[in-house]
Regions:
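Aromatic- and acidic-residue-enriched segments that line the glycan-binding/catalytic groove
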Residues: 28-40, 73-95, 133-152
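The substrate-binding groove and active-site-proximal loops of carbohydrate-active enzymes
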Residues: 32-47, 95-110, 151-161, 224-232, ...
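Active-site-adjacent "subsite" loops/lids of carbohydrate-active enzymes
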Residues: 43, 52-55, 65-118, 278
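Aromatic-lined carbohydrate-recognition surfaces of secreted/lumenal glycan-active proteins
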Residues: 58, 63-73, 129-136, 156-196, ...
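Substrate-binding cleft of secreted/luminal carbohydrate-active enzymes
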Residues: 207-221, 230-316
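Aromatic- and glycine-enriched glycan-recognition loops and surfaces
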Residues: 1-10, 37-60, 157-167, 237
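Catalytic domains of carbohydrate-active enzymes, especially glycoside hydrolases
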Residues: 2-25, 120-130, 206-211, 283-293
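Aromatic-lined carbohydrate-binding/catalytic grooves of carbohydrate-active enzymes
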Residues: 10-45, 137-144, 305, 312
Length: 316
């Protein structure tokens, strides 16, 4: 209730609510019971409790986005190791801080879309946002040695699998009257296919919303230059590249960017407050990325929101 009252007193117009976030399971959907009993066992809330929250958000006039982590799911891999990316011995491979269902496997597609449909029908979300819609990063050493099995039954490239999953999900979810979004790494604004299967034009061309995640503290330093100490310049450079990818896309999605709203996780751990976050927003607008933004701060601290009140009250 406090978050809703805060949002009503500013120009915030939407909430992003987790359906699932890796091993943090929002509520006890029967879809988990069917496809991933372990996830069902660890649900944090009941369906009724979640319905009440989303109803309050919607009744207050806000746009409700249901965020769903896709190919980062240790619980599913525990329940179905046969669909997990595996090592050379056939055992699920723990890489990039998780076990990963293979994006090549259609049963995984079926599960995630079934979960999205259930969320739309029971929670009345306006949009489903697929996060971790990619293969794991940092698999180079395994691929070089041949010590990894992606379960690639159809002989697809990674980028083909990601685009085809999103085409499948979008076609189905549009039948339920909702929009579909996809989160992509900041690197995806480059003019190449990434090693984890995200290619901006291929994704932007098939979903309704594409959300880059160009957090300045995720960029590599260049000598003594730390990008996270220069949020305006970092986002300006990134947005220029992202705008080019949008221009190359025949039917581009709406751009709605995730921006850094937390203190940097790299030295000198500089604070991100009204000035820094405002600089990020300004940079996006100057490069023509005007589809809106979402502010990422995993703590969801009300104290932090109050600190940022001048920024959110002044939004245009």
């Amino acid at each position: 209730d406090k978050y809703i009252e805060y949002a009503k007193s500013t120009k915030i117009n939407a909430f992003v609510v987790n359906i699932m976030d890796g091993t943090s399971i929002g509520y006890d959907s029967p879809v988990y019971e069917k496809y991933s009993p372990t996830a069902y066992q660890y649900a944090n809330n009941t369906v009724a409790e979640y319905q009440e929250v989303i109803r309050k958000i919607k009744d207050a006039g806000f746009y409700a986005i249901g965020r769903l982590t896709t190919f980062n799911d240790s619980f599913f891999c525990q329940d179905h190791p046969e669909y997990a990316i595996a090592d050379g011995s056939g055992e699920p491979l723990y890489v990039a801080a998780s076990y990963w269902p293979s994006a090549f496997c259609r049963y995984v597609w079926e599960y995630k879309v079934a979960l999205a449909i259930d969320a739309v029908e029971t929670m009345d979300f306006d949009e489903i946002q697929f996060d971790y819609v990619r293969f794991p990063d940092n698999t180079d050493q395994y691929e070089a040695s041949g010590d990894i099995d992606f379960r690639n039954e159809y002989g697809e490239t990674k980028a083909q699998a990601i685009q085809r999953f999103l085409m499948y999900a979008t076609d189905i979810l549009h039948e339920y009257g909702v929009y579909v979004g996809a989160d992509v790494f900041g690197e995806t604004s480059g003019n190449y296919v990434t090693a984890y299967g995200q290619y901006w034009p291929a994704i932007s061309n098939v979903v309704d919303v594409i959300s880059g995640m160009p957090y300045p503290d995720h960029f590599s330093r260049n000598g003594t230059y730390r990008p996270w100490e220069h949020p305006y310049e970092t986002l300006l450079d990134w947005a220029e590249s992202a705008a080019k990818r949008q221009a190359e896309t025949p039917t581009p999605a709406l751009d709605r960017t995730w921006i850094q709203a937390y203190n940097a996780i790299q030295p000198p751990y500089n604070e991100y407050s009204v000035q820094e976050i405002g600089d990020e927003i300004r940079a996006l607008k100057e490069e023509g990325l005007t589809g809106g933004f979402m502010a990422w701060n995993a703590s969801c601290s009300l104290a932090k929101l109050e600190e940022l009140r001048p920024l959110y009250e002044a939004l245009e």
